[in-house]
From Swiss-Prot:
Taxonomic lineage: Eukaryota, Metazoa, Chordata, Craniata, Vertebrata
Gene designation: Rem1
Induction / repression: Repressed by lipopolysaccharide stimulation.
UniProt-recorded name of the protein: GTP-binding protein REM 1
Tissue spec. comment: High expression in cardiac muscle. Moderate expression in lung, skeletal muscle and kidney. Low levels in spleen and brain.
InterPro entries, sorted: P-loop_NTPase, RGK, RGK_GTP-binding_reg, Small_GTP-bd, Small_GTPase
């Protein structure tokens, strides 16, 4: 009888040890853009990454700045604008995102970035941006995660360092990738030359940055996260570009009452304008002047 009791106790212990843990108690790794949560019922806390399609809501008028609480009311949900930061490591993406969130003291464990939400008042109208600094984390995973990151944004900010030419070349390649990903829709893209305070170490001139923006049809601005120079102008410019794109897409196409010229006539006029060298220079100069104006398309 004693032997049987000991064998039953061993069997019970062995069964308890072999019982698998439930799925809900296993560890979850936040910070991956391509991993969707099982029940996305509210925004993650600031400083954490979200899934490819995070829940969106419209903050209440009483809220100011950035918030991590969600509301279950039916009228409080509205699409937010997701701004994806792209660029090589060390160009200052996380510094710009932290300044956007007014979060100066960063946790050492947040060096790979995260997601920051804040409501900005631009031109008398409130707009909520969700800035996603998850590009470095996605580069640690498979390439399809990076592709998901390139598709997740309402707008894109491509950052390079003016003191690092290789980061400038990488920014140009990222612009080409975005063009391939967003062929049908024209999303706002802003090329940012960060670390403008390192003037003595400059490897990329302002003229080169503007020329690149003109060629790739995007906006351009130089910033300094260290001096907090043009950081506010950058994110307010993102808001204005989003609004302009929204208005441009919503505007109905009104047919002109005049008779349109034939394709051959328009082609001849276009070629005649291109043959004039001065006209080309004027057009390029006009485009280079407008590429750094974030208040116009």
């Amino acid at each position: 009888m004693t032997l049987n009791t000991q064998q039953e106790a061993k069997t019970t212990l062995r069964r308890r040890a072999s019982t698998p843990l439930p799925l809900s108690s296993r560890g979850h790794q936040p910070g991956r853009l391509c991993t969707a949560p099982s029940a996305p019922s509210q925004h993650p806390r600031l400083g954490q990454s979200v899934s490819l399609n995070p829940p969106v809501r419209k903050p209440s008028p009483a809220q100011d700045g950035w918030s991590s609480e969600s509301s279950d009311s039916e009228g409080s949900w509205e699409a937010l604008y997701r701004v994806v930061l792209l660029g090589d490591p060390g160009v200052g993406k996380t510094s710009l995102a932290s300044l956007f969130a007014e979060k100066q003291d960063r946790d050492p464990h947040e060096q790979l970035g995260g997601v920051y939400e804040r409501t900005l008042s631009v031109d008398g109208e409130d707009t909520t941006l969700v800035v996603m600094d998850t590009w470095e984390a996605e580069k640690l995973d498979e390439s399809w995660c990076q592709e998901s990151c390139l598709q997740a944004g309402s707008a894109y900010v491509i950052v390079y360092s003016i003191a690092d030419r290789s980061s400038f070349e990488s920014a140009s390649e990222l612009r080409i990738q975005l063009r391939r990903t967003h062929q049908a829709n024209h999303v706002p893209i802003i090329l940012v030359g960060n670390k403008a305070d390192l003037a003595r170490c400059r490897e990329v001139s302002v003229e080169e940055g503007r020329a690149c923006a003109v060629v790739f049809d995007c906006k351009f601005i130089e910033t300094s996260a260290t001096l907090q120079h043009n950081v506010t102008e950058l994110f307010e410019g993102v808001v204005r570009q989003l609004r302009l794109r929204r208005q441009d897409n919503a505007a109905p196409e009104t047919p002109s009452p005049r008779r349109r010229a034939s394709l051959g006539q328009r082609a001849r006029r276009f070629l005649a304008r291109l043959t004039a060298r001065s006209a080309r220079r004027r057009a390029l100069k006009a485009r280079s002047k407008s590429c750094h104006n974030l208040a116009v398309l």
